[in-house]
Amino acid sequence: SQAIPQPPRVEPRRGAIDIEALARGKVHLPNAGAASGAAPTPLRIFITLDMPRASLQLLTDQAARAGAVLVLRGLKSQSMRQTVAVVQELIGKRRVAWVIDPEAFTRFTVRQAPTFVLTLNDAANDMQGNCRAGCATPASFVSMAGDVSLDYALEHMVRRHPGAAAVAGPYLSRLRSR
C-alpha cells in the first residue's frame, strides 16, 4: 500500500487572514484583546456589523477602555474572511476582545443590537451549552437595549438594579478615567 502524498502547505501572505488558524481557534488579530481561553468578562456588548458606523466606532472605543467584549451573532455575509476583515478595520489599533456567540443571544434574550449585558454572578458567566429561550435567569444579569453609550447603559442598569453597582462600578471608573 502506498501512502497518500500530502499537498504542499502554502504559508499565508503576511497580513492575510489565516482561516485554518482561525478555525482552530488560534488566530490572534493584531491589537485585538484575545478572549480565547480568558475568563469571561461580566460585561458584553451585543452588536451587529450592520449597525451605523458611528455607533460601532463609539462602542468599540468604549469596549476597549472598559474591558468589555463585543459579541456578534454570526458571520458577515456568511463569510469568516469578511467578518474578520470588517472587525479588524473596526478595531484598528485598539485592544478589544470580540466573539461570535449565537447562543449568547438566546442565553441573555437579546432581540436587538446594541444590547448591553452585565452578568452579576459567575454562574451566568460560565453558562455553556444549548438553551432555547433565555436560559440565564433574570436575577443573574441585567441588560439594556438601545443606541446609547456604554456609560449611559451601565448607569441605567445601576439605577434599575442597585445590586449591579458593585459589578458596574469598575467599568464606569475605567470609562470616566480616560
How would you describe each model-predicted region?
Residues S1-R44, T48-L90, M127-R178:
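Non-globular targeting/processing and membrane-anchoring segments
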Residues Q88, G92-A113:
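Thioredoxin-like thiol-disulfide oxidoreductase module
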